[in-house]
Amino acid sequence: MQISHKNFRNIGLIGRPDKSSVVETISLIHDHLISIGLHPVFDSETAELVPYKNTQTVSRALLGEVVDLVIVVGGDGSLLHAARALVKFNTPVIGVNRGRLGFLTDIKPTEVIFKLDQVLKGQFQLDRRFLFEMEVRSKGDLIYSAIALNDVVLHGKTVHMIDFDLSIDGQHVYRQHSDGLIVSTPTGSTAYALSGGGPILHPSMDAIALVPMHPHTLSSRPIVVGGQSEIKIAVHENRVMPMVSADGQQSVSLGVGDTLHIRKHPYKLNLLHPPGYDFYMACRTKLGWNQGFESLQQQD
């Protein structure tokens, strides 16, 4: 897919609502866009945070339909939330980090104008990330659906372990007794799945990681399968029935015999990075891979 900077005229702005530093950065970007002749558009939630009453405002659900590029100011969670609303429009997204790790929101606030100008001039890397579509079915009927950029997680309501069957592409894999299962995209492999002992998948990989959560059998290890795989989880009778969540959002309770279906979403997120983006450098910085060695390298 080709994305041309010449089409960047209407620029959507989304900000994390609970940080004053976000308002400062959003205001800086807003004023800069106007100064270079572009048209900023707030999503309705962000518009409530800023003092610009004459700037166009659109609901987040429709923002991707009216803008050519969306700038998200916040943490990775803010970009996850925005991605789920924007992906069906194929609208490119760029992130400014006002959160913690910032694997997805990789522009520093101190560099925002310089880096943003590079992107607006066509100097960017296109990073296409796939999402999951998830369905919960009861007796064959669809009772809940959601999309996820990071992961779909089956988990218990309490500390009790749960029993479930896992199938991949119609083939039975195992029945497991554990705290749950994390089904992760490459994007999500540096999030919750990583803390569960899962592998780090490069964002370009067409793969899915399945990471057991504290399995009762120590031989139950993470599995990596092809990105086109269809995952099915069947719930058995449990002392406390499990729940499922997509990207850590609303959790839905599952009953005996309910099935969870996970597959690749038909659309991809078009994530833009400024020049010089390096996934491995992000891992070194965010995950502290070089801790203890940087001072030694400087001494050498």
Go through the PLM ranges and name each one.
Residues 1-69, 110-125, 136-146, 275:
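ATP/NTP phosphate-donor binding region
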Residues 13, 72, 183:
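Redox-cofactor binding/interface segments in oxidoreductases and associated redox assembly factors
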Residues 16, 71, 75, 97, ...:
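A residue-level signal for conserved active-site and pocket-lining positions in enzyme catalytic cores
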Residues 22, 77-83, 189-195:
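Short glycine/serine/threonine-rich phosphate/pyrophosphate-binding segments
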Residues 86-96, 103:
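Gly/Ser-rich helix-loop-strand patches that form or flank binding pockets
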Residues 100-179:
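Catalytic core of DAGKc-family lipid kinases
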Residues 154-155, 169-172, 219-300:
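ATP/nucleoside-binding phosphotransfer catalytic cores, i.e., glycine-rich phosphate-binding loops
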Residues 174-219:
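Gly/Ser/Thr-rich active-site loops/lids in small-molecule metabolic enzymes
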